[in-house]
Amino acid sequence: MNIAKLIDHTILKANSTKEDVMKVIEEAKEYKFASVCINPTWVKLAADELAGHDVDVCTVIGFPLGASTTETKAFETKDAIAKGATEVDMVINVGALKDGDNELVEKDIYEVVQAAKGKALVKVIIETCLLTDEEKVRACELSVKAGADFVKTSTGFSTGGATAEDIALMRKTVGPNVGVKASGGVRTREDADKMVAAGASRVGASASVAIVLNDAKGATDNY
């Protein structure tokens, strides 16, 4: 298995500098990761630098709380795509999900999917650490109904990250035709292999180089 092609090489810390982001971009070129996952402010830089390379440009929408308005998320998506993003990882409205407002949650996702249609993959971050199992299932079902390409466990900025149990539940819920992304706390090759075995088709990590080289000592967190 080519683990590198399953990894979104990630740098989302608020204090990331241009030098930090360039390092991630160069590593993505060298190791041929699936994508770089960066904050929207770095999308144009990444798109320019990765032109001609088989590495997607992934950014985050409504991140990390998911509490911006649907209109804002849709605008962020269009703006990111205009600057060169080919994948967007959006955060659901977690509070609305917990309120049982399925209509709002679905519309929130749907509007981002429509804004990205034909131009970028949409991954929906459900923030599993804040949800009950019933809420996780409902979030996945609403994501599929709204037309999302992937469901994703975590932002990496809340109280917990991906677990193999959550990945298995998400995979069971969405079926074989929607992607499942594990992110948050995936720092070693063993972690990544566990997630893939549980059903993940993509892994978000900042310790991507250490994962590929199977070097636990090199693992760091840029979430």
Swiss-Prot record:
It is found in: Cytoplasm. CDD domains: DeoC (cd00959). SUPFAM superfamilies: Aldolase (SSF51569). GO terms for cellular component: cytoplasm. This is Deoxyribose-phosphate aldolase. HAMAP family: DeoC_type1. Pathway: Carbohydrate degradation; 2-deoxy-D-ribose 1-phosphate degradation; D-glyceraldehyde 3-phosphate and acetaldehyde from 2-deoxy-alpha-D-ribose 1-phosphate: step 2/2. Its main location: cytoplasm. It comes from the Bacteria. It comes from Bacillus cereus (strain B4264). InterPro entries: Aldolase_TIM (IPR013785), DeoC (IPR011343), DeoC/FbaB/LacD_aldolase (IPR002915), DeoC_typeI (IPR028581). Its EC number is 4.1.2.4. The keyword Cytoplasm applies. Catalyzes a reversible aldol reaction between acetaldehyde and D-glyceraldehyde 3-phosphate to generate 2-deoxy-D-ribose 5-phosphate. One of its GO terms (biological process) is 2-deoxyribose 1-phosphate catabolic process. The keyword Lyase applies. The active site is at D89 (proton donor/acceptor), K152 (schiff-base intermediate with acetaldehyde), K181 (proton donor/acceptor). Belongs to the DeoC/FbaB aldolase family. DeoC type 1 subfamily. The lineage of its organism: Bacteria, Bacillati, Bacillota, Bacilli, Bacillales. It catalyses: 2-deoxy-D-ribose 5-phosphate = D-glyceraldehyde 3-phosphate + acetaldehyde.
